[in-house]
Regions:
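A domain-start/cap signature at the N-terminus of enzymes
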Residues: 1-9, 32-154
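A short beta-turn/strand-edge loop motif at beta-sheet boundaries
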Residues: 16-24
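Extracellular/periplasmic catalytic domains that process cell-envelope and extracellular macromolecules
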Residues: 138, 150-153, 193-197, 235, ...
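Active-site machinery of serine-nucleophile hydrolases
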Residues: 154-156, 160-221
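Active-site-proximal beta-strand/loop segments in catalytic clefts of secreted hydrolases
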Residues: 159-163, 204-207, 243-247, 252, ...
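Gly/Ser-rich "nucleophile elbow"/oxyanion-hole loop immediately N-terminal to the catalytic nucleophile
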Residues: 210-246, 262
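Short glycine-enriched nucleophile-adjacent loop
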Residues: 249-261
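A conserved short beta-strand
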Residues: 261-267
Length: 267
């Protein structure tokens, strides 16, 4: 099962004191995820949520407490799928933490400081080691893409996403193809990199849809941007691979027809 990026953990940082005596009932964590202002007001957005997260366990880590959530509680996602727009778009995330019962507090030297109740503020910043490997590249009058730099590797993998990850109304979010499923991040895993002997990764985001690639000149734009990366990164032109799913499979096929000598293999 691949439901895309999901928030499964929150870290509470208590600064210069240690806390203990916490359990999953100590806190209530409320999640609000919204695409308001990014879509028509009457558009149904299935990932817009306003609910408490289901806490499955907590772990005490000295001055920090880690709260783990049920990834299937309905509010874990960082994208929202639009019913008629047929696109996944990034949500604005707002988490609120309420402490229900006092926690035991001690100084760094172990001195007992009694019990206390804290007020919490959230950064609402998602940290993801897999997506952090990629850099957003935006191209004027071209096709935006996410890029994984594999250092001195001389191979390149090109990925074309499915229709739900295309851009929405010119927002140029350039992240839906990174977050909606593992189609992009999988190529940068240790396992995939070992198989390919290290390879750079380009994950394009369609300005709208791949289905109009010929009419919209996307084949030529993708080709030119691939050639630019080949030249800039010193990639062996005989070690360029391509893959895609759904609408991205269509785009992959169109690229193979138009540029039959560009790719070593297609998947």
């Amino acid at each position: 099962e691949d439901n895309g990026q999901a928030i499964y953990k929150m870290v509470l940082d208590y600064g210069n004191v240690k806390v203990s005596g916490v359990d999953k009932d100590t806190y209530t964590v409320h999640a609000k995820t919204s695409t308001e202002g990014k879509r028509p007001a009457d558009e149904t957005a299935y990932g817009d949520k306003d609910q408490d997260r289901t806490i499955v366990r907590v772990e005490e880590k000295g001055t920090k407490v880690e709260i783990y959530f049920d990834e299937n509680d309905g509010a874990a996602g960082t994208l929202s799928y639009l019913a008629t727009g047929a696109r996944n778009i990034p949500v604005d995330i707002e988490y609120t933490v309420t402490q229900n019962t006092p926690v035991k507090v001690s100084a760094m030297d172990g001195t007992d400081l009694g019990e206390d109740t804290f007020v919490y503020s959230c950064t609402n910043t998602v940290e993801d080691e897999e997506t952090a490997k990629f850099t957003s590249v935006k191209v004027d009058n071209g096709i935006n893409y996410q890029y994984y730099d594999a250092g001195d590797a001389d191979s390149l993998i090109v990925w074309f996403h499915g229709n739900g990850e295309g851009d929405y109304k010119g927002s140029q979010n350039n992240v839906a193809q990174l977050l909606a499923n593992r189609g992009t991040v999988a190529w940068a895993t240790d396992e995939a990199q070992e198989i390919f002997g290290k390879a750079h990764v380009m994950s394009f985001q369609a300005p709208d849809t791949w289905y109009y690639a010929q009419k919209d000149g996307l084949l030529e734009k993708a080709y030119n941007e691939i050639q630019e990366v080949i030249s800039k990164k010193g990639i062996d032109p005989k070690k360029v691979y391509v893959s895609g799913c759904s609408a991205g499979g269509y785009m992959t096929t169109r690229m193979l027809i138009k540029y039959p000598n560009l790719f070593k293999a297609a998947m």
